[in-house]
């Protein structure tokens, strides 16, 4: 009986979670726009991750641990020790449930910064998976087009 009750409870919890994801009326691009604005621009790391990122979040950056809690535990102190860091989002591009965010990060006002492309996979209203590439903005360039 105890096993049956446990299975029923688990089944109801999974049904509720699936219904929540199915009820999400936001498109993946809207989910990522809200997440990245709250995270990168507003610097509300915990709030952004707890609202928009699945607990089983898969991280593909080899320098970062996987999982939502691991991301929060790394990023909160990072932003706290770098209060002048600033990100501006240049563009957000979506293809189905994959969303790419091209942004410019600067550690200070006089820093040339870094160009970042984050790729996020979204299911329902949750970011499930993340890849990124980061490139320093060079002092001199071979063209005048800029990186952003």
Question: How would you label these PLM feature ranges?
Answer:
Residues 117-145:
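Short beta-strand edge/turn micro-motifs at domain boundaries
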Residues 4, 8, 17-51, 143-148:
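Short, low-complexity N-terminal intrinsically disordered segments enriched in polar/charged residues
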Residues 101-108:
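Short beta-strand segments that buttress and anchor functional surface loops
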Residues 32, 48-49, 57, 71, ...:
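Hydrophobic pocket/interface hotspot
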Residues 75, 87-92, 105, 115-121:
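Hydrophobic/aromatic beta-strand elements that line small-molecule binding cavities or substrate pockets
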Residues 45-94:
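A solvent-exposed, acidic/Ser-Thr-rich amphipathic alpha-helical stretch
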Residues 82-83, 110-112:
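Short loop/turn motifs at secondary-structure junctions and domain boundaries
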